[in-house]
Structures are given as C-alpha cells and as structure tokens.
C-alpha cells in the first residue's frame, strides 16, 4: 500500500473512532432518562462533533458522521441509508456482517455491516415496536411492515443460527403502472390493453408466479383499471397494495395471534367479513391455504372482477395448487366456474420480470380443468447486453367465454 493509501486508511479509522465515541456519549446521555426531540438530538450531535479537537473534519465528513449517528439512534442504523436509496428494491440482512441488496433485479453484497449483534437486535426490536408487535426467543418469527409500508420479515435466534435475519421489501409511494411495466418490457401494449378490458368487464383474474417475480406489483397495476365508482375491499397478510384514485376503498389486514395464542384474525376471517360489506370487487393479496374456498365462493356468488395472486410454476400449476388447497369433492367445478383468467409471471435469466402466459380457464371437461392460452411469451434469443429478447405472442384471437366482455359492450375478444 502506498503513502496515500496508508493515509486514507488511517483517516477512516480515526473518523470511525470519532463516530463511535460520539454515539456512545449520546447513548449514555439518553440512558440517563433525558427525553429529547429529533431537532434537539441533531443539535447535540453537531455540538459533539464540534467539540472533537483531535481530528480536523471536512464539511462532508461532518455531515456523514451526523447522518450515521442520527440513523443509529432514531432510524434503523446502517439500514437507514439503504432504505432511502430508491435504486434498492430489497435489503437482506444475514447476521451482523452479511448484508445483501437487490438493485435492478440483481443481488449485490453491501459494504455496510452492524457493529455487533446487540445493534442488529436493537434494530429488529425497533421494527417490531413500530407495529406494536412482539419478537423474541419465544416468538422468533415476525412478518410486519415499516411505517412507509415496506414489508419486513424478521427471524431471531435460536431459529436463525448466525444471528438475527431481517429481510425488507421496499415500498414505493408511486407504484408501477401498466404503462411503466410496458415500457420495461414486462408486457406488450396489446396484452396490457386486453387485460385492462378484462378487468373493466369484471373477469376474475389470478396472478401466478414464483417468489419475487412481481405478482403484487402486477396486481397493483391491474387494480387501477377497476372503475372508480365501484366499492373495493382489499385483504392482505401484510399491507402492500397501493390502489390509487379509488374513492370507495376498504383495506383489511390479517393479524397474528398474541403471545397467549389468542385474537388471531386470518385471511379467511376477513374474507367472510368482507362479504357482509357490500363489495363490488374483492382483492386478496395472496391465496395460500384454506381461504381459497372462501375466495372461490365469493367469485361464484356475484363478486365478479375479483383479483388475487398465488405461488406456482405455471398457469396449469396454479390450478393444481388451488385444487390441493380446497378440501372438497366439487373443487374442480368451483375453480372452473370461478376463475376466468390466469396471468403467469416469471423471472428470466437476465433477472428481468415478464408476463409469460395469459390463459383462459375453460369449463370442466371430463373431470379436468382445461386452459386455453391467449398470450404466450416467445423467446427470440439474447441481445448483446445479455438481455433476454422476445415478446408475448397472441395464440387465440377470441375468448371462448366472452359473455362478460359482451355485457360490458367490449368487442373484438
């Protein structure tokens, strides 16, 4: 290492020592029981920085120290800066030393780390406190969200062997519209227009795909096609949906049981309650289990235009998974009569997210539920930049069950 390298390394160590020292002094002050406002905390930090005579700090260095200390005390420590970076979509903390980020669909290692397990555990407790929830060794798993709506999963020891694990899927004030998804190549303009008409006409639509393929984002985009004069009820495990410009909107969120195992409110409970709330449309963030029967019954009893998502490897697999969720001999008939369309999403080799198939669910035939592909992604190779090239190709000119389109005055399908 040359002289400049030694100098920079030595300076970074001095700045780190200064930052840690100021933070410790302020923590001691807070431990004495003094309640201070954010404004006063900022003033105290600046005063402490000015008092440090053993190192001359540039303005940029002073501001950096101020931000770090404020985030450690009032925010989420080293995660705060990452949360404020709009280019980051997901933050994964695997113990104190390993932090990974998702940026533009790709994972990368972050240079930041937590000083010790106590600091990381403190952040986990702060997140839990925001939603008035409990997470500890007895209850080591928590799914919750931050004040801005970002979804958070926390797993603590002894379940997490290498220390607390925190995963944050960030929430954006401005959700992706179908126009932006079209611009990103996730769907063609023609297929997007077809889905817009299907939503307006009241088709029941399931969005399927694997983890992280953008199901909730796509559900958000489709929900904005719902006519503005309709009453919408959303039901979620953890609130993520961002339906804009809906005047008559009711948002419901499930609740885990308390430490005594009581007061749980499930998706199924909320679905049953929603049917007594005069909904025009019911949107369920994700169907995972027994609530599938209630969702299918709602779709079959006049609540057309309902939307939901589910984990699956294909549109056909989504049907199979629904069959296993519903303990009923007549389940296939219920599925065939309830669901009109399945939109299947996937992540490509280049990490991009695309609509891979739009399929129509047909009436039961010989005890099976047939699917009819309307659009299908056709890969056409790879570009020089490594991007997967291709487009959604229309496989069927018209819908077999087009009664809802006709009733809505929509032709051409």
Whereabouts are the PLM-identified features?
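N-terminal anchoring/assembly modules that precede and organize ATP-driven motor systems
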Residues: 1-108
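Active-site phosphate-binding and catalytic loops of NTP-dependent enzymes
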Residues: 54-57, 74-85, 127-145, 230, ...
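P-loop NTP-binding catalytic core
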Residues: 85, 98-201
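Switch/coupling sub-region of P-loop NTPases
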Residues: 192, 202-208, 221-338, 344
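Walker A (P-loop) phosphate-binding loop of P-loop NTPases
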Residues: 212
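Conserved lysine of the Walker
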Residues: 215
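Hydrophobic positions on the alpha1 helix immediately C-terminal to the Walker A/P-loop
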Residues: 218
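NTP-binding/hydrolysis catalytic cores, primarily Walker-type P-loop NTPases
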Residues: 350-413
């Amino acid at each position: 290492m040359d002289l400049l390298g030694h100098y920079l390394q030595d300076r970074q160590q001095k700045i780190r020592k200064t930052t840690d020292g100021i933070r410790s002094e302020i923590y001691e002050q807070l431990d004495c029981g003094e309640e201070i406002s954010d404004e006063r905390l900022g003033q105290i930090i600046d005063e402490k920085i000015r008092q440090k005579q053993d190192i001359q700090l540039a303005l940029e260095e002073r501001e950096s120290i101020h931000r770090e200390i404020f985030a450690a005390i009032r925010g989420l420590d080293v995660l705060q800066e990452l949360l404020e970076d709009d280019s980051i979509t997901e933050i994964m903390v695997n113990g104190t030393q390993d932090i990974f980020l998702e940026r533009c669909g790709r994972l990368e290692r972050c240079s930041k780390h937590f000083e010790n397990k106590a600091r990381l555990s403190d952040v986990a407790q702060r997140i839990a406190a925001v939603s008035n929830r409990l997470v500890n060794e007895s209850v080591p798993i928590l799914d919750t969200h931050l004040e801005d709506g970002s979804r958070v999963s926390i797993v603590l020891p002894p379940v997490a062997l290498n220390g607390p694990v925190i995963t944050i899927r960030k929430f954006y004030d401005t959700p992706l519209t179908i126009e932006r998804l079209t611009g990103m190549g996730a769907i063609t303009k023609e297929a997007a227009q077809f889905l817009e008409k299907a939503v307006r006409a009241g088709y029941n639509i399931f969005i399927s795909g694997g983890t992280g393929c953008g199901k909730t984002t796509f559900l958000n985009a489709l929900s904005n096609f719902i006519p503005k004069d309709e009453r919408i009820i959303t039901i979620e495990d953890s609130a993520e949906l961002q339906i804009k410009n809906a005047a008559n909107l009711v948002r419901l969120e499930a609740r885990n049981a308390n430490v005594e195992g009581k007061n749980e409110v499930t998706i199924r409970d909320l679905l049953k309650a929603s049917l007594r709330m005069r909904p025009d449309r019911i949107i369920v963030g994700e169907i995972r289990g027994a609530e599938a029967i209630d969702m299918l019954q709602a779709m079959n009893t006049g609540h057309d235009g309902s939307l939901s998502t589910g984990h699956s490897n294909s549109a056909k697999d989504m049907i199979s998974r629904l069959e296993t969720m519903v303990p009923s001999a007549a389940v296939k008939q219920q599925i065939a009569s309830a669901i009109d369309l399945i939109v299947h999403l996937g992540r490509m080799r280049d990490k991009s997210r695309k609509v891979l198939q739009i399929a129509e669910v047909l009436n039961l035939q010989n005890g099976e539920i047939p699917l009819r592909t309307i659009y299908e992604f056709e890969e056409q190779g790879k570009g020089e930049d490594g991007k997967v090239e291709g487009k959604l190709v229309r496989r069927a000119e018209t819908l077999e069950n087009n009664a809802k389109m006709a009733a809505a005055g929509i032709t051409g399908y």
